[in-house]
């Protein structure tokens, strides 16, 4: 269940981050409301996953890595962001770092 909380937290964070540009500096009401609600839900669900037993370092590392990869994917597919070798390498390094952190915590 803690991983479900975390995955939902990541989803909410990705949605909120994807709305940031459309808020136009938090001057547009509904995108701003959606963005802030999304971040609120994301942090509440992250807190639930941690309070139900997930280690904070693991939760935050997974949140960061999966969230970053998902935001890059959303930005490239839906927001017109160009893809580059450096973006792919950067996301790959983040994923390798998270795997390493999780393996270190498993022993």
Curated annotation (Swiss-Prot):
A GO-annotated cellular component: plasma membrane
Top-rank lineage group of the source organism: Bacteria
Membrane disposition: Multi-pass membrane protein
Localization of this protein: Cell membrane
InterPro entries named in the record: Small_drug/metabolite_transptr, Small_multidrug_res
One GO biological process term: response to antibiotic
GO MF term (any one): efflux transmembrane transporter activity
Chain segments annotated as transmembrane: 2-19, 29-51, 58-80, 84-106
Keywords (A to Z) from UniProt: Antibiotic resistance, Cell membrane, Membrane, Transmembrane, Transmembrane helix, Transport
Keyword Transmembrane (UniProt): yes
Family note: Belongs to the drug/metabolite transporter (DMT) superfamily. Small multidrug resistance (SMR) (TC 2.A.7.1) family. Mmr subfamily.
Function, as annotated: Multidrug efflux pump. Confers resistance to tetraphenylphosphonium (TPP), erythromycin, ethidium bromide, acriflavine, safranin O, pyronin Y and methyl viologen.
Comment field (misc): Extrusion of TPP is inhibited by CCCP.
Record protein name field: Multidrug resistance protein Mmr
Gene that encodes it: mmr
